[in-house]
Curated annotation (Swiss-Prot):
The lineage of its organism: Eukaryota, Viridiplantae, Streptophyta, Embryophyta, Tracheophyta. May control the interaction of photosystem II (PSII) cores with the light-harvesting antenna, regulates electron flow through the 2 photosystem reaction centers. PSII is a light-driven water plastoquinone oxidoreductase, using light energy to abstract electrons from H(2)O, generating a proton gradient subsequently used for ATP formation. It comes from Glycine max. InterPro entries: PSII_PsbZ (IPR002644), PSII_PsbZ_sf (IPR036512). This is Photosystem II reaction center protein Z. Keywords: Chloroplast, Membrane, Photosynthesis, Photosystem II, Plastid, Reaction center, Thylakoid, Transmembrane, Transmembrane helix. PSII is composed of 1 copy each of membrane proteins PsbA, PsbB, PsbC, PsbD, PsbE, PsbF, PsbH, PsbI, PsbJ, PsbK, PsbL, PsbM, PsbT, PsbY, PsbZ, Psb30/Ycf12, at least 3 peripheral proteins of the oxygen-evolving complex and a large number of cofactors. It forms dimeric complexes. The chain crosses the membrane at residues 8-28, 41-61. GO terms for biological process: photosynthesis; photosystem II stabilization. It holds the Pfam family Ycf9. It is found in: Plastid, Chloroplast thylakoid membrane. Belongs to the PsbZ family. One of its GO terms (cellular component) is chloroplast thylakoid membrane. It comes from the Eukaryota. The gene is psbZ. NCBIfam families: PS_II_psbZ (TIGR03043).
Length: 62
């Protein structure tokens, strides 16, 4: 269970870093938002899911 928690935290950190870089780039580029809207929404949905997963796994470990 600890390994799953550590992998979930690592994935959350990795996705956070990717979104931190990619979202401003998408907003700054011309026509970037209309072309990459689905990618940003998918990344945000994945991030929200990982936040809940880390919370659930944390409550099971503690």
């Amino acid at each position: 269970m600890t390994i799953a928690f550590q992998l979930a935290v690592f994935a959350l950190i990795a996705i956070s870093f990717i979104l931190l870089i990619s979202v401003p780039v998408v907003f700054a580029s011309p026509e970037g938002w209309s072309n990459n809207k689905n990618v940003v929404f998918s990344g945000t949905s994945l991030w929200i899911g990982l936040v809940f997963l880390v919370g659930i796994l944390n409550s099971l470990i503690s």
